[in-house]
């Protein structure tokens, strides 16, 4: 084995020299240069500095503007709440432990950090799935005379929390476990060992099938059907320039959604799966650290893509930031009037508001 396994930890270094120490008790500077921990802490501080304001602003603006408090926007609020879970439950903890060079908060802290980081990430992931399904149902109308209402939105929210807990809670009760990973200053699911009594193998397979592959397939299916629906609508009005513009906007939006989903989660999932299927193989601490912390940046991508590109929300946000007056209101109003013909396509396909 090209690593050192101990009680509730796995350090990716062979302990031939005897320098490997528990990541709960000693700095791990023998793994990487201490400057790397400083850079990691600075990166987490940047995510907090950007992620908290943009997600908090999302909640505040929605509460302040009644027209944003619609069933279709509930899932976007859920997305912001999930991102705040990651900011407070994961990012602050990781920044603090990075400053010390090891997981100074101990085993209990590892469970708490791993749980909240996983919970926030899974809520965000399943929120995107529910959003994709909602867009598909509203735009493509597979169910005739269906109207998306408040009860459907609440059921969607409950579903995201149920699925997130189904992934984040089992390691707390003995089905797998949370251990320090990468540079040993943040915690995640144990992909690394086959420790007796934890059934890591079955949990990792369950997680990859139910909490990655299935969501990815659903997102691709729903947005693929949405693109087809928009193209069909545009083909029926080929003489309309505004409709063609709406088609391009929706195409760009969907591509950004899918690419962001893959950019955030595919590297982490791929590396985790490789480690799981090649347990005992040699890999460095940075090998898992980079994709893990890149996935955390989804707390910034999510509100920017799914909310800030919403024209109605952007209008309300500018109004809030400018103390009740939108200096671009007249310009946006004229632009909106010129796009009346395409509103049925763009409002139902691009913007969830």
Swiss-Prot record:
InterPro entries: GPCR_opsins (IPR050125), GPCR_Rhodpsn (IPR000276), GPCR_Rhodpsn_7TM (IPR017452), Opsin (IPR001760), Retinal_BS (IPR027430), Rhodopsin (IPR000732), Rhodopsin_N (IPR019477). The modification N6-(retinylidene)lysine is found at residue 296. The keyword Lipoprotein applies. The keyword Zinc does not apply. Keywords: Cell projection, Chromophore, Disulfide bond, G-protein coupled receptor, Glycoprotein, Lipoprotein, Membrane, Palmitate, Phosphoprotein, Photoreceptor protein, Receptor, Retinal protein, Sensory transduction, Transducer, Transmembrane, Transmembrane helix, Vision. Glycans are attached at residues 2, 15, 200. The record marks 113 as: Plays an important role in the conformation switch to the active conformation. A lipid is attached at residues 322-323 (S-palmitoyl cysteine). Disulfide bonds join 110-187. GO terms for biological process: absorption of visible light; G protein-coupled opsin signaling pathway; visual perception. It is a multi-pass membrane protein. Its main location: membrane. Phosphorylated on some or all of the serine and threonine residues present in the C-terminal region. Contains one covalently linked retinal chromophore. GO terms for molecular function: 11-cis retinal binding; G protein-coupled photoreceptor activity. Photoreceptor required for image-forming vision at low light intensity. While most salt water fish species use retinal as chromophore, most freshwater fish use 3-dehydroretinal, or a mixture of retinal and 3-dehydroretinal. Light-induced isomerization of 11-cis to all-trans retinal triggers a conformational change that activates signaling via G-proteins. Subsequent receptor phosphorylation mediates displacement of the bound G-protein alpha subunit by arrestin and terminates signaling. Belongs to the G-protein coupled receptor 1 family. Opsin subfamily. This is Rhodopsin.
